[in-house]
A protein has these predicted regions:
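Short, amphipathic alpha-helical interaction segments positioned at domain boundaries
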Residues: 478-491
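C-terminal scaffold of the Radical SAM
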Residues: 122, 143-166, 171-445
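Short hydrophobic targeting helices and cationic amphipathic motifs
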Residues: 15, 29-31, 36-39, 97, ...
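A short, conserved structural fragment
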Residues: 460-469
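Compositionally biased, low-complexity flexible segments
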Residues: 47-107, 111
């Protein structure tokens, strides 16, 4: 990769992260460390991720996505939960800009203006459980350690389900997801109560996947057995590493032995669909340490593995250490090598690298995640959760106190440019990429021709490919997908 490409990547990182602020936070939840994976290689020269000082290029708005919103001090614990969601007045100039965009789009203006991003006849429910026992050294998502507020929060979430019962229209709910925070701190009866209430208010007769994020040390045999009875059929276990020293550095509350045991216990309890999270790019823990973690993960045989690159955020323990000069991100070449190691190891073991951060055995792609990437409607319940009805984004306040108190959600209608950019940002993260015929039908021939024209330098180097009428970044090159996306965004 030549110096020009590296420089371009640095600019890309800044631009794409700014634009990414406009994606829903529930999408961002599943991207979680999203741009940590393919954009982190440029963190040393780029500002912090959304919620950490980034401002979107077009207009100010909340960081987009359902689960973890950075901080507002929420309670006496002072946990870092840097909130990117702010209660704000509506901006009348948005309508003027949308009309200007429509006129600029020419003959396709009306069609694009009436286009809904919801392209999939399914819907998802997301429940945000923000509580944590301990703050991880890398985490700047919205969280609270006030565990005694679990039941008042659950009651407020049940009220929100009732108030928003018409949000998804007639579309059936196909996926349900509990994210956090640490949802495995939630009693099974509370989880079951939320699912039961949702089933009374929405069409959940065809649910295909119900996921709960969990910490390894929470997964006792009794808890797992009770969890199965609630309807949870997929666990996302936040292991991060199978190295005790690395876990200690990250301030994780489990050990490597507990991590492995949690997977075995989940199998014994009857869970046949497991995904585990791993983090790479941790200074001092690459090479053989990462390889051992990957080998241990493969020996446990999860159906799905998510691998994220560590990002050092300002309002975290790692960020404070970095500010003092005693902690720094790994070098760009190290990031590239570790990404390659993850890709090569997992694909050789039969996992499909189907999205920047995600690997699955055949038939076990994350269905809830895929709904975000392909424009399905979803309803986010809980503090900091975001929702999308096909045309508008809605977001809840990132505060347990204010959420329980009934704070009104914010909302914004997507402009044509927002829709186009989000289409690129989500689809080009996947191995399938975008279909050129579909893109033309949705956004017009002129935009599609511009995509083909401007992506040519990347296709000539093999960083992107156009095959069978589809544009995609090959999985082995996904570390550079940010640069490809930046080329195509409308700013």
């Amino acid at each position: 990769m030549c110096g020009i490409r590296r420089h371009k990547g640095r600019k890309t990182f800044i631009l794409v992260k700014r634009i990414t602020v406009k994606i829903t936070k529930n999408i961002y939840y599943f991207f979680r460390y999203a741009y940590r994976f393919n954009l982190q290689i440029h963190t040393q020269v780029a500002p912090a991720r959304e919620g950490g000082g980034i401002r979107p290029l077009v207009r100010k708005r909340p960081a987009a996505h359902g689960p973890r919103h950075p901080p507002e001090q929420d309670g006496p614990e002072g946990a870092t939960a840097r909130t990117a969601v702010r209660k704000r007045a509506k901006h009348p100039e948005k309508a003027d800009r949308a009309e200007t965009d429509r006129r600029k789009s020419g003959g396709n203006g009306n069609r694009i203006r009436n286009f809904s991003l919801s392209l999939v006849a399914m819907a998802g429910l997301y429940f945000h459980i923000p509580f944590c026992k301990r703050v991880c050294a890398y985490c700047d998502f919205y969280k609270s350690v006030e565990l005694d507020r679990m039941e008042p929060l659950a009651e407020a979430m049940r009220r929100e389900l009732e108030a928003r019962r018409d949000y998804l229209g007639s579309e059936p709910v196909r996926t349900r997801y509990f994210g956090g925070g640490t949802p495995s701190l939630c009693p099974p009866e509370t989880i079951g109560g939320l699912l039961a209430r949702a089933a009374e208010l929405f069409d959940c007769s065809a649910v295909e996947e119900t996921t709960l994020e969990a910490n390894p040390d929470d997964l006792t045999p009794a808890y797992l057995e009770a969890l199965r009875r609630t309807g949870i059929d997929r666990l996302s276990i936040g292991i991060q590493s199978f190295d005790d020293a690395c876990l200690k550095l990250m301030n994780r509350r489990h050990t490597a032995a507990q991590a492995a045991e949690s997977v075995r216990r989940a199998r014994e309890a009857g869970f046949g669909n497991l995904t585990i999270d791993l983090i790479f790019g941790v200074p001092g823990f690459g090479g053989d340490t990462l390889r051992r973690s990957l080998d241990t993960a493969l020996a446990l045989g999860p159906e799905h593995i998510s691998a994220y690159h560590l990002t050092i955020e300002p309002a975290t323990a790692f960020g404070r250490r970095a500010a003092r000069g005693d902690f720094a991100p790994v070098e760009e070449e190290v990031s590239e090598a570790e990404f390659g190691l993850v890709h090569d190891t997992l694909t050789a073991a039969g996992y499909e690298h189907y999205e920047v951060s995600n690997f699955a055995r055949p038939g076990f792609r994350a269905r809830h995640n895929a709904a975000y990437w392909h424009g399905a409607k979803y309803l986010g319940i809980g503090p900091a959760a975001h929702s999308f009805d096909g045309r508008e984004r809605h977001w809840n306040v990132a505060s347990v106190t204010q959420y329980i108190g009934g704070a009104e959600p914010g909302s914004e209608t997507l402009s044509e440019r927002d829709r186009f950019n989000e289409y690129l940002l989500t689809r080009l993260r996947t191995a399938e990429g975008i279909g050129l015929a579909e893109t033309e039908a949705l956004f017009g021939a002129e935009r599609t021709a511009r995509i083909v024209r401007e992506v040519r330098p990347w296709t000539e180097t093999g960083t992107a490919e156009i095959r069978g009428g589809r544009l995609a970044v090959p999985p082995r090159r996904m570390l550079l997908s940010d640069a490809v996306i930046e080329t195509l965004l409308e700013t």
